[in-house]
């Protein structure tokens, strides 16, 4: 996979791509990336990339020319048909399923904006996806794109050391993830559930599934509307106040 990030502040990304899992993935060439300052594509003599909105109003709007030209330039370098992702609060909210969908692509282009917004023609004519990371507004699209890139890259083959890690994450099954425990088995009197020490993998799997169901019921009940439950699981959740662990 190759990722192009169009931004006015490429320096914001250096720490992200030089740390942790993303850095290892870059070193192993499991994905490549380019940071593109779309100001460099402005044909304005002062390299302006924004202007006042037609019809009046507060703030400045990103002009279409620099972004159109930047997107077309990075497309031509790879001769590809990439997904062009606009980070904006009006987009669809990022989900694990969306990340899994994007992880199947060969080329992603992220557009990170600033100011009041984008000229609508950018949305209409070059963007394939609009993504938001939540119902709040940031100063720019950079932080949001970092979140999306991280959630996508970790799903690429061999990026995570344990290939079972990603499929078992929260939301991958439609449920929140079950609780985790490690050594010691007894810490300050707080004990690990006996079933996890039993070595009976069928019982462990059953316990984990039940805990995922109960945790989802208690914390994100809306997610249960999107999955099919067995009769036994429905009985589990029909108790008055199911408790975790």
Swiss-Prot record:
Keywords: Cytoplasm, Methyltransferase, S-adenosyl-L-methionine, Transferase, tRNA processing. InterPro entries: Alpha/beta_knot_MTases, tRNA_m1G_MeTrfase_C_sf, tRNA_m1G_MeTrfase_TrmD, tRNA_m1G_MTases_N, tRNA_MeTrfase_TRMD/TRM10. The lineage of its organism: Bacteria, Bacillati, Bacillota, Bacilli, Bacillales. It catalyses: guanosine(37) in tRNA + S-adenosyl-L-methionine = N(1)-methylguanosine(37) in tRNA + S-adenosyl-L-homocysteine + H(+). Specifically methylates guanosine-37 in various tRNAs. One of its GO terms (molecular function) is tRNA (guanine(37)-N1)-methyltransferase activity. PANTHER family: TRNA (GUANINE-N(1)-)-METHYLTRANSFERASE (PTHR46417:SF1). CDD domains: TrmD-like. GO terms for biological process: tRNA N1-guanine methylation. Belongs to the RNA methyltransferase TrmD family. Pfam families: tRNA_m1G_MT. GO terms for cellular component: cytosol. S-adenosyl-L-methionine binds at residues 113, 133-138. It comes from the Bacteria. Homodimer. It is found in: Cytoplasm. Its EC number is 2.1.1.228. This is tRNA (guanine-N(1)-)-methyltransferase. It comes from Oceanobacillus iheyensis (strain DSM 14371 / CIP 107618 / JCM 11309 / KCTC 3954 / HTE831).
């Amino acid at each position: 996979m190759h990722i192009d990030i169009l931004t006015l502040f490429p320096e914001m990304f250096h720490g992200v791509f030089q740390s942790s899992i993303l850095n290892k993935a870059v070193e192993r060439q499991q994905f490549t990336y380019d940071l593109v300052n779309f100001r460099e594509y402005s044909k304005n003599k002062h390299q302006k990339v924004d202007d006042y909105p037609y019809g009046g109003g507060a703030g400045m709007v990103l002009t279409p020319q620099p972004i159109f030209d930047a997107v077309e330039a990075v497309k031509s370098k790879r001769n590809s048909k990439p997904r062009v992702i606009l980070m904006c609060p009006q987009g669809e909210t990022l989900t694990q399923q969306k990340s899994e969908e994007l992880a199947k692509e060969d080329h992603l282009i992220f557009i990170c904006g600033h100011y009041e917004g984008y000229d609508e023609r950018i949305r209409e004519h070059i963007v394939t996806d609009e993504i938001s990371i939540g119902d709040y507004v940031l100063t720019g699209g950079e932080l949001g794109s970092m979140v999306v890139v991280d959630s996508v890259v970790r799903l690429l083959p061999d990026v995570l050391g344990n290939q079972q890690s990603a499929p078992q994450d929260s939301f991958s099954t439609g449920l929140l993830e079950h609780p985790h425990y490690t050594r010691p088995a007894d810490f300050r009197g707080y004990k690990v559930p006996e079933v996890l020490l039993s070595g009976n993998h069928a019982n462990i799997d059953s316990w984990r599934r039940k805990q995922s169901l109960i945790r989802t019921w208690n914390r994100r009940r809306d997610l249960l509307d999107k999955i099919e439950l067995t009769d036994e699981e429905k009985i589990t959740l029909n108790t008055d106040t199911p408790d975790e662990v």
